[in-house]
Amino acid sequence: MPIIIDKDLPARKVLQEENIFVMTKERAETQDIRALKIAILNLMPTKQETEAQLLRLIGNTPLQLDVHLLHMESHLSRNVAQEHLTSFYKTFRDIENEKFDGLIITGAPVETLSFEEVDYWEELKRIMEYSKTNVTSTLHICWGAQAGLYYHYGVPKYPLKEKMFGVFEHEVREQHVKLLQGFDELFFAPHSRHTEVRENDIRGVKELTLLANSEEAGVHLVIGPEGRQVFALGHSEYSCDTLKQEYERDRQKGLNIDVPKNYFKHNNPNEKPLVRWRSHGNLLFSNWLNYYVYQETPYVL
């Protein structure tokens, strides 16, 4: 089934070339069916790339989705044209009186700061509080997951001595949770972060369930009561070359960055990346949409 996006959104062409079914709002309004309202709070500086990554995954389901892109009003985005934000994005103030079936909160390159030092923290807190009563289920990704765990449950983050960077093997810890329906017992997911949350802190919160972790990368998937809040510390949405681009960017900046682990063939950055997370990435997003959004949301929000 299609996703509904603005006909002029640049990601639309990319998705159509990949056979992801997208639909204009004009066409969708002629159908006698209610699309799921999904908001994406895009905190990444590379907004267009993140749009394509997430739309690619949520568009690969048999559900019709009405997607609303959000940005932070209290933060000046320097890496994206203001025209793009004006044309395709809304702020929380624009939608705070609406309800949504699902919300995705992305990562952000601010993890070395304390949460309170982030310039849009107060606005983000309002959005996370709003999500508790106005959103059926919220999926938090990477720093967004750290922020959600901290705000909702007081789970802290800790600095890492070295960046967690690469593609890592994870083990399913809860076999019968719907979010992991169809998962292999061992699966891969990318990570790219300078901080971590710790398993002992997660297990110390009775409302939280640890679903999957890695011996090397640590906590990956966590779920709250009734699936209202889902936390993914890794980046299952990443495209094939995202880690490569991050690696090359940091090298160009003169940073001391290691080759991403388990990513390039033979761990050689001159060779092609080896994609081992795509199928489980699709499964993660489709399970979230199906079991925690579509099957739980009321017809009238």
From Swiss-Prot:
Belongs to the MetA family. It is an enzyme of class 2 (transferase). It comes from Bacillus cereus (strain AH820). The keyword Acyltransferase applies. Pfam families: HTS. The record marks 111 as: Important for acyl-CoA specificity. Transfers an acetyl group from acetyl-CoA to L-homoserine, forming acetyl-L-homoserine. The keyword Cell inner membrane does not apply. Its EC number is 2.3.1.31. This is Homoserine O-acetyltransferase. Substrate binds at residues 163, 192, 249. Keywords: Acyltransferase, Amino-acid biosynthesis, Cytoplasm, Methionine biosynthesis, Transferase. The gene is metAA. The active site is at residues 142, 235, 237. Pathway: Amino-acid biosynthesis; L-methionine biosynthesis via de novo pathway; O-acetyl-L-homoserine from L-homoserine: step 1/1.
